[in-house]
C-alpha cells in the first residue's frame, strides 16, 4: 500500500501494488478490517523518512510551520503499523534510517547496512534490476538503517560483501549521482536493499528454504 501506486492497482512479479493514503485514519481502519481475518505471515512498514530522518532535520522547522503536527503524524503511523501487526500476531519490522523515532517512540531493536546482506544476492544477479547506475552491485554500499521489530522477528545472519569506497568528499557513488528533492531521488535512496529483503524472507518466512 502506498499513495504513489496507481488507483487502479497493478501486479508485478507476484506483488500487488495498491493505492492508499496511509495517513488517512479511515483508510487505515479499512486495511485493518480487510486483513484481520486473512492468512498474513509477515508485516513490513516504511514510514516517510523525510519527516523523521535526522539527515533532514534542517528542514523540520519549515515543515512544522506548514503543518505543526507533521512529525506527530509520521510517528503515529509507525506506531499504528506495529499495533496492526501485533493484533495479527505476525512477525514484523518497521524500517527507517537514523531518525526521531528513537526518541519519540522507542529505541530500534536492530541496525544494519545494505552491504552486510549483499552476499544473499547471486553474482549473476549482482546489478540492481531497476537502478543499476545508482545502486551498487550486490548492495555494496553503506546506509545505517534502523529496525523496530516484534512478534518473534528473526534478524537474519549477515553475509557481507565489501562496501564501495567513499569518494574524497565523503560521499558514496549513489549520493554523488543523486541530488535534489524529486520523488525519483527519494525512491532510489529509500529502496529496500534486495539482499536484506531476501535474508529476512529466508529467516522469517521460508525458514531457510530456497
PLM regions and their residue ranges:
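Adenosine-cofactor binding site in Rossmann-like domains, unifying the SAM/SAH pocket
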Residues: 1-35, 109-114
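A conserved beta-strand element that flanks and buttresses the S-adenosyl-L-methionine
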Residues: 44
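Short glycine-rich, polar/acidic loop-and-turn segments at beta strand-coil junctions
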Residues: 4-5, 47-49
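Class I S-adenosyl-L-methionine
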Residues: 31-35, 39, 49-209
Amino acid at each position: 500500500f502506498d499513495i504513489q501506486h496507481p488507483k487502479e492497482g497493478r501486479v508485478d512479479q507476484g506483488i500487488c501494488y495498491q493505492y492508499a493514503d496511509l495517513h488517512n485514519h479511515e483508510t487505515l481502519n479499512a486495511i485493518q478490517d480487510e486483513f484481520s481475518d486473512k492468512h498474513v505471515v509477515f508485516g513490513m512498514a516504511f514510514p516517510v523518512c523525510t519527516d523523521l530522518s535526522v539527515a533532514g532535520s534542517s528542514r523540520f522547522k519549515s515543515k512544522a510551520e506548514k503543518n505543526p503536527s507533521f512529525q506527530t503524524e509520521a510517528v503515529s503511523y509507525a506506531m499504528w503499523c506495529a499495533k496492526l501487526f501485533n493484533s495479527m500476531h505476525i512477525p514484523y519490522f518497521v524500517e527507517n534510517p537514523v531518525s526521531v523515532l528513537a526518541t519519540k517512540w522507542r529505541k530500534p531493536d536492530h541496525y544494519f547496512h545494505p552491504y552486510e546482506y549483499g552476499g544473499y544476492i547471486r553474482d549473476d544477479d549482482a546489478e540492481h534490476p531497476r537502478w543499476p547506475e545508482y545502486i551498487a552491485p550486490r548492495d555494496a554500499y553503506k546506509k545505517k538503517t534502523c529496525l523496530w521489530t516484534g512478534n518473534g522477528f528473526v534478524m537474519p545472519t549477515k553475509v557481507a560483501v565489501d562496501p564501495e569506497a567513499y569518494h574524497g568528499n565523503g560521499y558514496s557513488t549513489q549520493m554523488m549521482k543523486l541530488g535534489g528533492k524529486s520523488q525519483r531521488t527519494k525512491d532510489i535512496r529509500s529502496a529496500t536493499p534486495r539482499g536484506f529483503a531476501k535474508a529476512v524472507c529466508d529467516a522469517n518466512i521460508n525458514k531457510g528454504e530456497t
